[in-house]
C-alpha cells in the first residue's frame, strides 16, 4: 500500500498490494482499506498519536500463499529496508516458499511505485525473474526520491528524524528535504520561508540537472494539500521541467502518518534503458 500508485495503473498492470497498518488511539487499521489518508489527517489535526506499521510475517505468508495460487513465482518489492521492518518481515515469510523473491526497492512511496511499474511491465512481457531482479537493482540507482517536509513534528514522533533536528527546524523555520540514499532516509538539504518560497526553491533544485531526467512520468505525491497549492506545484513543474505524464498522487495513510500534512515529493526516474509504455486508459486527466 505504500507504493502510492493510482488505481488506474494498479488495474492496468494487475499489481497485488499487501497493505501496511496505521495505528491510532482507536486501534490498528489496514492502510487504504480501513483507514483513508483524509481520515488520518483529521486524527492528526486533533493531536492524536498515529504511526505506521508493516505487515506481520504471518500477513506476508498469507499474501504469498494466495498469490502462488495465481502465479508460479512471486516477486515482492518492499519499501527501503532501513526505513521499515517490512523488508525483513517479507524476507522471513518468504523462507516458507521456494518461489518467492523479496527485493528491497531502496525507496518509498511513488518512487518505490516506479520500480513496481517497471517490474510489472517486464513481467507482462515474460522476462525471467532473474532478469527482472537484475534490472530493478540497476534501476534503483536511477530513481529520484526526495520529499520536502512542511512540519517536522510527525517525522520526529515516527522516529525518522531526531528531536534535535526537529527543534532546529522549528526554531529557524526550516523545511528539511528528505532523500533516500542506500535505502536510508537522510536530510539532504534545508529550505526556508513560506510555502510558495520553499516549494519553488525545492522544485528548482530537484530539476537542476534536467538533461538527465526521464520525462515520461512524474509523481507529485502529497499529503494534506488544497487544490490551490497543488496547482502551484504543477505550474512550477511546467516551468522548470515539463513531463509527458504528471500524476497527482495522494500519499497513503501509512506514508502521511510519517511526513505529516503539507509535505510533498517530486518523484521520477533519471534517464535509463528500462522500457515502460503505459496505455492511454491510465493517462492522468489534465485537471487532476
Q: Positions of the model-derived regions?
A:
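N-terminal glycine-rich anion-binding loop in soluble enzyme alpha/beta folds
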Residues: 1-54
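Mixed-charge interfacial surface used for oligomerization/domain docking
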Residues: 2-24, 73, 83-101, 107-288
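Glycine-rich, highly charged phosphate/nucleotide-binding loops
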Residues: 53-62
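Short, well-structured alpha-helical segments in soluble
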Residues: 62-69
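Flexible, active-site-proximal loop/turn residues at the rims of small-molecule/cofactor binding pockets
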Residues: 80
Amino acid at each position: 500500500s505504500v507504493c502510492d500508485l493510482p488505481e488506474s495503473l494498479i488495474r492496468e498492470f494487475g499489481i497485488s498490494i499487501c497493505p501496511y497498518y496505521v495505528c491510532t488511539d482507536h486501534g490498528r487499521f489496514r492502510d487504504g482499506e480501513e483507514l483513508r489518508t483524509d481520515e488520518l489527517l483529521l486524527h492528526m489535526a486533533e493531536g492524536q498519536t498515529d504511526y505506521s506499521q508493516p505487515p506481520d510475517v504471518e500477513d506476508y505468508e498469507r499474501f504469498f500463499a494466495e498469490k502462488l495460487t495465481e502465479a508460479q513465482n512471486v516477486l515482492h518489492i518492499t519499501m527501503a529496508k532501513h526505513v521499515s521492518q517490512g523488508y525483513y518481515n517479507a524476507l522471513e515469510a518468504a523462507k516458507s516458499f521456494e518461489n518467492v523473491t523479496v527485493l528491497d526497492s531502496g525507496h518509498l512511496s511513488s518512487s518505490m511505485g516506479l520500480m513496481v511499474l517497471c517490474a510489472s511491465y517486464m513481467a507482462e512481457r515474460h522476462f525471467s525473474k532473474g532478469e527482472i531482479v537484475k534490472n530493478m537493482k540497476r534501476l534503483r540507482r536511477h530513481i529520484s526520491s526526495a520529499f520536502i517536509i512542511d512540519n517536522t513534528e510527525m517525522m520526529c514522533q515516527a522516529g525518522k528524524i531526531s528531536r534535535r533536528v526537529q527543534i532546529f527546524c522549528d526554531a529557524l523555520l526550516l523545511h528539511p528535504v528528505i532523500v533516500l540514499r542506500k535505502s536510508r532516509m537522510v536530510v539532504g538539504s534545508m529550505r526556508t520561508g513560506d510555502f510558495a518560497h520553499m516549494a519553488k526553491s525545492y522544485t528548482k533544485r530537484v530539476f537542476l540537472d534536467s538533461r538527465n531526467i526521464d520525462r515520461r512520468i512524474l509523481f507529485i505525491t502529497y499529503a494534506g494539500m488544497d487544490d490551490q497549492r497543488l496547482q502551484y506545484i504543477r505550474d512550477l513543474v511546467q516551468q522548470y521541467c515539463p513531463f509527458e505524464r504528471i500524476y497527482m498522487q495522494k500519499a497513503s495513510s501509512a506514508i502521511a502518518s510519517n511526513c505529516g500534512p503539507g509535505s510533498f515529493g517530486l518523484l521520477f526516474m533519471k534517464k535509463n534503458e528500462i522500457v515502460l509504455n503505459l496505455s492511454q486508459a491510465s493517462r492522468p486527466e489534465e485537471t487532476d
